[in-house]
């Protein structure tokens, strides 16, 4: 590679013809950390930990499938002529918003089946979701994907980035914006924010909705820097969805406060049967 810059090896473990990539290791680590955090949060909320484990068992495969379906829908011009590629998820092509949609739908159905409050469940897992996303973006870093537009080494050095990040952003002779890093840091800040505001006088469900608003706001601007956006005509799909989610979440907060009077988050004790609020 030009300039003598070598990218990091995306393969973590090589055993004969079997290779385990850093992307998979990082995503798996993110899931484990998210699970441990959610279990800890469930314990504080007096929630049965098995509920979190059971939800995860359903949410992981459904989220992967929905992330793939979401990606295929907006890349249909390619997949309609390559139908066999649809199931080849190992070739790449999943979308985080698709995964989140699948996870939320799973949680809604799961909470109804278990007769528990979706909002209580969503509040418990919200910090776990955003920290998992922060960690997961480093899988994109190892694959040299989800980057932004062309830039210069001088610009990256001006950000005071470690050398290994600058070198990894040198792809095919060109330096690119590390949008993976921008989103990862934004999510870390969001995680800290959620830990702070959960101690304030927010209502049940608003921790999760705050997560949606925070993530969507950052994603809207970061998506505008990326070069691999899924498109819907002339619009970036993730930007459109981000705006819709922000409006929907703010609307839900206002509506629930005016019409449903949900309990305060810190006072909303978990119960087996969800109350109508």
Swiss-Prot record:
Pfam families (alphabetical): LGT
List of residues binding a 1,2-diacyl-sn-glycero-3-phospho-(1'-sn-glycerol): 137
The UniProt record lists the keyword Transmembrane: yes
Protein's cellular compartments: Cell membrane
Keyword set, alphabetical order: Cell membrane, Membrane, Transferase, Transmembrane, Transmembrane helix
The organism's place on the tree of life at top rank: Bacteria
Sample GO molecular function, one term: phosphatidylglycerol-prolipoprotein diacylglyceryl transferase activity
Primary residence: membrane
Residues passing through the membrane, by range: 22-42, 51-71, 89-109, 116-136, 177-197, 205-225, 235-255
A GO BP entry: lipoprotein biosynthetic process
Cellular compartments per GO CC: plasma membrane
Pathway involvement of the protein, from the record: Protein modification; lipoprotein biosynthesis (diacylglyceryl transfer)
Membrane-topology descriptor: Multi-pass membrane protein
EC number from the UniProt entry: 2.5.1.145
InterPro entries listed in its UniProt record: Lgt
Similarity annotation: Belongs to the Lgt family.
Job description of the protein: Catalyzes the transfer of the diacylglyceryl group from phosphatidylglycerol to the sulfhydryl group of the N-terminal cysteine of a prolipoprotein, the first step in the formation of mature lipoproteins.
Protein's name in the database: Phosphatidylglycerol--prolipoprotein diacylglyceryl transferase
Top-level taxonomy: Bacteria, Bacillati, Bacillota, Bacilli, Bacillales
